[in-house]
Structures are given as structure tokens and as C-alpha cells.
């Protein structure tokens, strides 16, 4: 067993980057990739990801967890499709209440203090990874599908990208005392939903060359 665990949410993303390893096997127990790191698949969304990552960390001792995946970038944040970013801070973007006028109020606003989840200092990373662009992420259960929601979420949280597991990964790793980092490759702009414009294979190729090959 290695000291670093590389965690994926999606079996499809994992299969693209590690075609030689069964995603089904990696979802049940971490698989070693030589002497470099172990890999695992924890499931899409905060619930599956947090439960499965917690299960793995309760059985195996890792000093460091690196989460890899794709993400959407919000409009107007000067982030390009295919760009690799390091998500250092996350908030949960759709946890809160709706008031009588139909307006969404974030949970942090309700309790009077922001609820922020953070990764560890990039100074703990190899120089190549420490120099990757740092961004703020929003973890959601329902992905943005309109330009209106994209601008609203990015403005409300001053956020750059949208994920479905980032906050969960940070929270679980902190609980288990493992240092944690999250890298994402932008596959699309989170705006009016148009899957024909998505560049998932290209984003995953960038993730491999810029992150995996530099671990």
C-alpha cells in the first residue's frame, strides 16, 4: 500500500485514465499503481463519495488524498475548457432554504457564518502541482443548467468552478487526519446546458498530463 490515495468519483473518468484496472475492483478496495500511489473510485455526488471514501480511510492508512475529476467553470471567470485547476476551497452551493418569496438563502447565511471546506497548503505538493491555478469551488447536488443559475451561484459564493464532491472530500479527509488536495480539469462552461460543447476526453487527457504524470 502506498501513502497517497488518488480518488475519483466517476467510474467513466477512472476507466479513461486507468483502462488496465477494473473500476469495479477499485471501487471496493484501493489498487496500487506501482510504488507511486493507490487509486479508488468513490461514487458520484456528496453522499456516495463521502460514505465510500470514509470507508476506505477507516480500513487503510493514507497520509495524503488527491481527488481528481472534471468540472464545469462558471461564466465570466476567465477559465477555459480543458484548463486544469486546483480547487483549494469549496462551499456547498445548494444547501439552505427557500424563503416565502422563492429566494434561496445559503446555509451559511442562515447560521450567521460561512461554511467553508478547505484543502491543504499547496506548499506540501511538488512544485509543478503547487503552481497549478488555484480556484474556489461550489459543491452541488444539482448541476447548473442555465446561464442565470451560473451567474447567480458564481456571484453568491465568488466561485470559479462547480463540482459534485469537493466539499465532501475535504470534510472526510480532515476527519481522518489525511492531507487533501483536489484537481479538476474543466470539461465545460456551466451555463445553458449543451452537452455537444463538452470536452470530456480532452479534459481528462489534460488531467493526466498535468497532474497524474507529475505525482
Walk through the language-model features, giving the residues of each.
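N-terminal short beta-loop-beta anion/metal-coordinating cradle
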Residues: 1-55, 59-60
Amino acid at each position: 500500500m502506498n501513502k497517497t490515495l488518488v480518488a475519483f468519483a466517476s467510474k467513466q473518468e477512472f476507466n479513461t485514465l486507468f483502462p488496465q484496472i477494473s473500476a469495479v475492483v477499485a471501487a471496493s478496495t484501493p489498487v496500487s499503481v506501482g510504488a507511486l500511489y493507490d487509486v479508488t473510485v468513490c461514487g458520484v455526488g456528496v453522499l456516495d463519495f463521502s460514505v465510500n471514501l470514509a470507508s476506505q480511510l477507516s480500513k487503510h492508512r493514507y497520509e495524503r488524498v488527491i481527488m481528481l475529476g472534471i468540472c464545469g467553470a462558471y461564466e465570466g471567470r476567465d477559465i477555459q475548457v480543458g484548463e486544469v485547476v486546483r480547487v483549494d476551497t469549496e462551499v456547498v452551493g445548494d444547501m439552505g432554504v427557500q424563503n416565502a418569496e422563492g429566494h434561496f438563502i445559503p446555509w451559511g447565511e442562515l447560521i450567521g457564518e460561512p461554511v467553508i471546506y478547505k484543502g491543504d497548503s499547496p506548499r506540501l505538493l511538488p512544485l509543478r502541482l503547487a503552481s497549478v491555478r488555484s480556484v474556489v469551488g461550489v459543491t452541488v447536488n444539482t448541476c447548473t443548467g442555465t446561464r442565470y443559475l451560473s451567474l447567480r451561484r458564481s456571484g453568491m459564493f465568488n466561485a470559479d468552478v462547480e463540482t459534485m464532491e469537493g466539499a465532501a472530500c475535504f470534510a472526510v479527509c480532515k476527519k481522518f487526519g489525511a492531507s487533501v488536495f483536489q484537481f479538476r480539469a474543466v470539461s465545460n462552461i456551466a451555463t445553458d446546458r449543451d452537452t455537444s460543447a463538452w470536452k470530456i476526453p480532452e479534459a481528462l487527457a489534460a488531467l493526466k498530463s498535468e497532474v497524474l504524470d507529475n505525482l
